């Protein structure tokens, strides 16, 4: 890490999924300076990482959408009751653009350390790129932000390809002529 100046914000949000995007919008509306630190190269959280074939929400799409703005509700039309991953990702990108939130998101900036100093009532946050100081640190990382990699005896000796839903490759996968095992 370069020896740079500590950047100060009223609030730091870790994660640019649905919760992080909402927090950034609300904090800005309160007049607070805030930034999202996002380890991925785009927003979406779960809906960015989980792009495996057939990924979709398990509740009605309308319930998944933000309820804080009636105009937003009226301008977005879900194509099906239980939307697939690409449409959900398109929706959250629409929200970020509509409310001009992208300038408050630092992409490819994974938090490596967050320390609260009680005597100062401040958080000190470090990433591979920057150091930050803030009064409020909101962890909007969600319960699916860390892949659950199985640990089987002999797995380290397996020479084939291992794919997980939580880290599914962006490019299309071809399983023709391959032996495939599905676990879980």
Provide a role label for each language-model segment:
Residues 9, 32, 135, 177-179:
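Nucleotide donor/acceptor-binding cores
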Residues 71-78, 84-88, 141-184:
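Glycine-rich dinucleotide-binding loop and its adjacent helix/turn
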Residues 33, 48-91:
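Glycine-rich active-site loop/strand segments that organize a redox cofactor
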Residues 78-145:
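Feature captures the FAD/FMN-dependent oxidoreductase FAD-binding
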Residues 19, 41-42:
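Conserved Rossmann-like nucleotide-cofactor binding loop
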Residues 1-11, 29-30, 58, 90, ...:
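Extreme N-terminal leader/targeting segments of oxidoreductases
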Residues 6-36:
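N-terminal Rossmann-like FAD-binding beta1-loop-alpha1 element of flavoenzymes
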Residues 43-48, 146:
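A short beta-to-alpha transition loop/helix N-cap that caps and shapes the active-site region
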């Amino acid at each position: 890490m370069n020896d740079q100046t500590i950047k100060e914000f009223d609030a730091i949000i870790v994660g640019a999924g649905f919760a992080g995007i909402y927090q950034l919008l609300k904090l800005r509306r309160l007049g607070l300076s805030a930034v999202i630190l996002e380890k991925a190269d785009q927003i979406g959280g779960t809906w960015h990482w989980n792009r495996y074939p057939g990924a979709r929400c398990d509740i009605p799409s309308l319930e998944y959408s933000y309820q804080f703005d009636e105009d937003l509700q009226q301008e977005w039309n879900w194509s099906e009751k239980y939307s697939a991953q690409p449409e959900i990702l398109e929706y959250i990108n629409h929200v970020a653009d509509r409310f001009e939130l992208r300038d408050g998101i630092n992409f490819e900036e994974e938090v490596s350390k967050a320390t609260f100093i009680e005597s100062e009532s401040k958080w000190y946050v470090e990433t591979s790129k920057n150091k930050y100081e803030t009064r409020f640190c909101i962890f909007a990382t969600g319960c699916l932000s860390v892949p659950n990699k199985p640990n089987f005896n002999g797995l380290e000796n397996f020479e084939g390809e291992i794919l997980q839903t939580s880290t599914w490759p962006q490019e299309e996968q071809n399983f023709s002529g391959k032996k495939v095992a599905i676990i879980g």
